[in-house]
Amino acid sequence: MKTFALHILSPDRTFYDGECESLVLPIVDGKYGIMADHSNTIAAVVPGELSYRTPDGRTHYAAVSAGMVKVEDNDVMVLVETAERPEEIDANRARRDADAAKEAILQKKSIQEYRSAQANLARALSRLRVKRGSK
């Protein structure tokens, strides 16, 4: 299968830098799939589950937060605030974060606080999905 260069970066580290056969990541419109020879594009990444298949046939998963993806000439760059492998996720902390976000949503504060709580909830739930999916 044809491959492309994939770079997944966050402010504090290079999460992955290597060849890839396919990539699926969360964008505003849903899950977005990328394979070799994909058309050039730029899209906003939303909190959720990212997966990519390496040339050895293994599929890897990560919980990502908001960011962007740029596809250009078989070179894909994913820039996100955070990217976590399943083994890096503390499920108890993610549950606490989800509970706190749900409580904040119910408190009916300003629109900005409401949207922030929604984003926190989405991130916590995606972290839990990635953690559960790794077992």
Task: Show where each model-derived region lies.
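Compact, glycine-rich, soluble single-domain proteins
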Residues: 7-100
